[in-house]
Amino acid sequence: LLGRIHRFGDVVQSVHMARQFGIKNINMDLIFGLPTQTADDWKQTLNDVLSISPDHISAYGLIPEEGTSLFQALENGTLSLPDPDLERNMYDCAISMLHAAGLYQYEISNFASPGKECRHNIGYWTQVPYLGLGLSAASMIRCPDRDNQTDPFSIRWTNPSSFDGYYAMLEQDGIPEEIKETISPEEARFETVMLSLRMTSGMHRGDFLQLHGEYPEKWYGEILYRLKGQGLLELRDDSWCLTRRGMDLQNSVLVEFMN
């Protein structure tokens, strides 16, 4: 259905081999909301995966990608996606079963044993600067010496995808950047909201202050307290966090901040 070349038995074998070679933190990516998939199918998938005790699980709702055979089958009506309520029930089922198995939810789609969270992704969600080396790699740095709220917050760039282009830029000035984007303070504040609210720990007010020079209420106070009154956000341990209902309606919540 998804064009994968492996079966579950191959996955089990790969996990066992990884452990034999000393790898102690193993993640498994799962997709729910597939055409023809039932709630019982999804429960069986979760039980099968939990039987090999992964340290980390990422569970994503299916997003059909244009150009794939699955996308074409959905377009011409050969296949259809499950009802949104069924997909939401599958998500709730994953949260419940994974929590019972000792994998706590630390981000909308990610679950881990304590101490086994994905530090790589957490870096993106908390806007930690990063340097990408090689073809098509992306980088982000904060602008130094920012002294007011109008200076650019950060710069992002992407390296060329072809070796010839990459090498030519290295020879020319030593900086192989193909796409460069300057992030304004306003854009950076929204990205902080968007990324931090993905995490169950939420948007810590002190962290926002350190990044942007003011608490989030300066720019978003009316929105934050309105969403809190609607039961979509809560203020917990000095952090603004999505409630369980807010996680279901995350896209609608973010639209409020975009407006």
What are the language-model segments listed below?
Residues 239-243:
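Minor-groove-contacting beta-hairpin "wing" of winged helix-turn-helix DNA-binding domains
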Residues 1-214:
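C-terminal scaffold of the Radical SAM
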Residues 228-238:
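A short, conserved structural fragment
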Residues 214-228:
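Short amphipathic alpha-helical interaction segments
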Residues 245-259:
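Short, amphipathic alpha-helical interaction segments positioned at domain boundaries
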